[in-house]
């Protein structure tokens, strides 16, 4: 039996991008004891997708991610892909939030979205935030970033079910081709040296040694840190 949905997908109660009535029904079916009077607050700082904190009447929190409002490129805002990666890494050595569920029915909230558990911690978005932390904690954060990145690159993509996430061959060649196309589309003058460097790199592509996961935007403010300087979760996949 189909459940009823409100058709409002614009600003609701002052929050654009969420439909409280529909989302309440969605949460009720997937979260035991979901409380009354949920609130939705957009988390500032992200630019690729809209991210909201969802809080029920008892104070429990979750995080909802959806594409930006308006026309978007599906490949750049693929919620199912992001949900799949985080779910696959749940039992790995890479810390990620626990996933609650994915919704690809756009009648619920105007666009696909997924929900994950809220991870408490520190997000170092700028120098001012970092300056409030002791030197030893900042040092540990830096080391943790490197260690977790190494763990990510060591994940066996087939073992975690991501072996078919993307093409497995010719990664460097495809990257060089993309960069040249982007350069040619954006340049307004002749820069022959750039093309010379491109041709040199193409001629020296090393043999591929394996297949791994590349985050694509791995940086400190796409992580949540503990007070001890350890990564609690890697975000923005």
What are these regions (language model features)?
Residues 3-5, 178, 231:
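Short acidic (Asp/Glu) and glycine-rich catalytic loops that position anionic groups and cofactors
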Residues 213-215, 220:
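Catalytic-loop of the protein kinase fold
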């Amino acid at each position: 039996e189909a459940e009823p949905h409100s058709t409002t997908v614009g600003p609701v109660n002052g929050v654009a991008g969420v439909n409280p009535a529909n989302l309440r029904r969605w949460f009720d079916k997937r979260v035991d004891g979901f409380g009354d009077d949920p609130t939705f607050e957009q988390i500032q700082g992200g630019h690729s997708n809209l991210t909201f904190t969802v809080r029920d009447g008892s104070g429990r929190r979750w995080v909802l991610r959806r594409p930006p409002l308006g026309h978007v490129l599906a490949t750049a805002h693929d919620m199912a892909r992001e949900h799949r990666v985080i779910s696959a890494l749940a039992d790995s050595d890479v810390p990620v939030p626990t996933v609650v569920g994915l919704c690809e029915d756009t009648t619920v909230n105007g666009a696909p979205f997924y929900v994950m558990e809220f991870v408490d911690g520190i997000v170092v978005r700028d120098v001012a935030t970092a300056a409030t932390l002791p030197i030893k904690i900042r040092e540990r954060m830096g080391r943790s970033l490197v260690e977790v990145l190494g763990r990510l690159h060591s994940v066996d993509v087939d073992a975690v079910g991501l072996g078919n996430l993307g093409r497995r061959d010719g990664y460097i060649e495809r990257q060089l081709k993309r960069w040249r196309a982007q350069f040619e589309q954006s340049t307004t003058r002749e820069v022959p040296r750039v093309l010379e460097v491109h041709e040199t790199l193409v001629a020296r592509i090393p043999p591929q040694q394996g297949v791994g996961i590349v985050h694509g935007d791995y940086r400190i403010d796409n992580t949540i840190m503990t007070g001890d300087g350890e990564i609690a979760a890697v975000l923005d996949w």
